[in-house]
């Protein structure tokens, strides 16, 4: 290597004053020359990694005292492999040990302060000697360099011997987790992200979705304050932690949030006060049909409690799925407060970003929004009517908004309270009439705008404001002279259905992009968990075959290089981009070389990510093999 090539190495942070030139015949010089085309150029003052300064240790951290070995570890990390390579059980005889050290060649690192036996301090040079031959040592200027012989083989060409399970043991091959490196964020999702926060959102979930999920979680965690809301039973059957979802008052029906000890989920309980069922079989025969109905725009009914005595009366309770921070159409479009959940513990009102108040001042809702409601409600009615049922509760207080989704709630209550002797066709026609009333209320901005006396006054406003298609839908739903079905309004919806579908697909793309980002975060977590599982194991402190030299010493230095960087002033250098970049390069086995320095400053190692990856995979396989041998 010539001096002008830009390579400059010192003897460590503690005793480096002048650069030491490597002789032309040095094996370290040959190693660096052969990899010069693949690695970056390292010059004076230039860090080895583009975004990271060279690790400069400032102190030695004392090693904690040795403790008793933990209970036998259950092999729960079989899925930590980042390759589609079956794990192997390596017997003790095949475990590769650390490289040997001659006289005067020692590693002064934290592992030397373990409470070790004298036999472990002086390791026999002949122990697994064939496994150490791939390491080359060269001392220049008081610094010991470790490197491997230059080779043309790829990082994954190293061969491992397939081990056979001994008697009494079972060898289990698992496919592991596939290595994936998808570009983040997804290219076609860039138009859904603001430019100001584009860089921050490439690695983390978007703030809007984060706040929405946090608010929903807060709604799940709220508790009831008996001093404010009065006396509420501690439990109702298997439901506990009841919290009212409506303002307390004199009313015949109340709604609660409750936790079920059966499955650990939260449910919405609709209580009918003082209602005793005289003929349970006759009045509840449609409940099972409602339980079987599954549709995205219908809140599913889960359970009905008949003649419940928990409230000191004979109450009828319906249990539905709970959607936190969901608000009704009445709250969203006609009330001053919408989409809020009152927490009696702290007095906060938690508002969902998707449920923003939309006050109406003499005008109706936008036609695009009304068509979105029409399409979703029509889809729900189509599913209900196809099941041989009728909604019977289609009004502004029974339709909830959850995000951008419309859902019909409290279905089945009228079938139990007031069984209708009329035919199902007549009940379904009544659903369509209520559907038309709902559209009129949204279009006119008046909750009772569907009344005949008011509708005649507002009819001119609807004709001047909205399209012919919307007026035709209202006229069709209000027409009682002919028998009609929900399917007949599909031609009136026309191409607007595709607009709603495109918006839903766009929202799905956004959520999938966020999910893929969190999946990448999970991959890096598994990699960190895998590395920390191998390092500094207390139970192997007296095991010569598990001394933290060789592969595990490389991993310890790499951990310091990634997480324990310091600035020139000795302050902690906290850079998430550096951590994510290093872990990704380790995961893919990059050929880029980095310089790692021991905490004492006596040892510097130049190594590529591909070698570090092999060290991690091999050390983890050794740990799995040792664990299986110990717990046969």
Curated annotation (Swiss-Prot):
Question: What are the start and end residues of every segment in region (Disordered)?
Answer: 1-22, 99-127
Q: Where is this region: Knob domain?
A: 534-632
Give TM regions.
none
Where is this protein chiefly located? cytoplasm
| Compartments reported by the entry | Cytoplasm, P-body
The annotated regions of Basic residues compositional bias extend over 107-116
Q: What Gene Ontology cellular-component terms does the record carry?
A: P-body; PAN complex
Where is ATP bound in this sequence? 270, 321-328, 397-398
Q: Which residues form a coiled coil?
A: 495-533
How does this protein assemble?
Homodimer. Forms a heterotrimer with a catalytic subunit PAN2 to form the poly(A)-nuclease (PAN) deadenylation complex. Interacts (via PAM-2 motif) with poly(A)-binding protein (via PABC domain), conferring substrate specificity of the enzyme complex. Interacts with the GW182 family protein ain-1.
Q: What is known of its domains?
A: The N-terminal zinc finger binds to poly(A) RNA.
Q: PANTHER family given for it?
A: DEADENYLATION COMPLEX SUBUNIT PAN3, PAN2-PAN3 DEADENYLATION COMPLEX SUBUNIT PAN3
By sequence similarity, the record places it as follows: Belongs to the protein kinase superfamily. PAN3 family.
Q: Spell out the protein name for this chain.
A: PAN2-PAN3 deadenylation complex subunit PAN3
Annotated organism of origin: Caenorhabditis elegans
Gene name tied to this protein: panl-3
